[in-house]
Amino acid sequence: MGQYENTLKDIKKTLGVVPGFMKAIPKDVLTQDWPLMKKYQGGESEIPAKYREFIGLAISANIKCPYCALMHTAMATLNGATDKEMAEVAFLASFTARWSAMLHALQYNYDTFVKEVHQIGEYAKKAKKKN
């Protein structure tokens, strides 16, 4: 059995089915990407599964991908996400995009922004030490 066939077998063992979209991409891409997808989407990594799905959902919302949004919503729910958490993720996804749009529209000086972020970080560190 070749690498592609072994990959399909592993996908079926992991997901219960080999989704059609996985069969539709080039074989070499699937054999390279599947181990990474399996590890970082479904396996153990530094970021807990529910939080990985929140990240994926926030990105999905910003790139306006219904496929990704559906998958990340389902997987977040499977990993214990509550309705309140999902609502917060939706807000944070829109909030980040909105502020990014405002900074770009203002053509705010990036070097100034960097300095201000560092100032805020230093202030937050000091405030945290006091508490």
Residue ranges and their predicted role:
Residues 91-109:
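Short Fe-S-cluster ligation motifs
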Residues 1-51, 105-131:
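Acidic, glycine/proline-rich low-complexity segments that act as flexible tails and inter-domain linkers
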Residues 38, 56, 73-77:
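Amphipathic alpha-helical segments within well-ordered protein domains
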Residues 49-55, 83-90:
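Alpha-helical scaffolds flanking conserved acidic
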Residues 30-31, 71-86:
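Iron-sulfur (Fe-S) cluster-binding segments and ferredoxin-like electron-carrier domains
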Residues 55, 59-71:
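Short, thiol/selenol-centered motifs that function as redox-active sites or metal-ligating centers
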Residues 71-78, 104-112:
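Juxtamembrane/interface motifs at transmembrane-helix termini
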